[in-house]
Design a protein with these regions (language model features):
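ATP/NTP phosphate-donor binding region
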Residues: 1-76
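Gly/Ser/Thr-rich loops at beta-strand to alpha-helix junctions
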Residues: 17-21, 84-89, 112-119
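Flexible, glycine/proline-enriched loop segments at strand-loop-helix junctions
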Residues: 19-23, 107-111, 137-147
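Short glycine-/acidic-enriched loop or helix-start segments at secondary-structure transitions
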Residues: 23, 89-92, 122-123, 143
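Long, hydrophobic/aromatic-enriched structural stretches that serve as scaffold segments
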Residues: 71-97
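Short, acidic/small-residue loops that bind anionic groups at enzyme active sites
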Residues: 98-123, 130-137
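Conserved anion/nucleotide-ligand pocket segment
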Residues: 130-175
Length: 175
């Protein structure tokens, strides 16, 4: 599926918490995700340290912070997509805020992720950036099936086409 008039052309993938993206055990999923993003007409750019593995990512929060800063600096990247959640994104904070570098380089780009990424949503909100609490690369776009879940695909496509998502009103359950 090649989408005409898409808002997002290049997705930058970051590993801000868990480094599983670099492990051999998930490379078949990574391949599926890359193929899906390309079918949507998107270019995929993995940030420099995003695929270094669990140990490296855990031991180097400064490199994770560097990847996020570089994703904002890179004008070819339209959307920043988190690889997956995790449990230690808070370790990036000193590397992002102690010298104000993130504040100096941040500009409006779609930022998408969930779970431990909530910390990133909060810090970007504090800098005036609108973010989307939603899909991650591994958990949603690399879904191990013939296609993505229809609900997930619908809202992801809406985001890359328009740069926004219409308000979703859930139907009430009748119990």
């Amino acid at each position: 599926m090649n989408l005409n008039n898409i808002y997002v052309k290049t997705v930058g993938i970051v590993s801000l918490s868990c480094g599983i993206l670099g492990e051999d055990s998930v490379q078949h999923e990574v391949k599926i995700g890359i193929e899906r993003l390309k079918k949507f007409g998107l270019n995929v750019k993995f940030m420099e340290h995003s695929r270094k593995g669990l140990s490296y990512i855990s031991e180097h929060p400064e490199k994770r912070a560097e990847d996020l800063i570089n994703a904002f600096k890179d004008d070819s990247i339209d959307m920043i997509l988190c690889a997956i959640g995790g449990d230690d994104t808070y370790k990036l904070l000193p590397y992002l805020f102690d010298n104000d570098e993130l504040k100096r380089v941040v500009k409006q780009k779609n930022f998408l992720g969930f779970s431990d990424t909530t910390m990133n949503h909060l810090m970007l909100h504090k800098l005036g950036i609108k973010t989307f609490y939603g899909q991650s690369f591994l958990a949603d776009l690399c879904e191990l099936d013939k296609c993505m879940l229809p609900y997930t695909e619908k809202y992801f496509v809406e985001l890359i086409r328009t740069g926004k998502i219409k308000k979703n009103r859930a139907k009430r359950c009748m119990v």
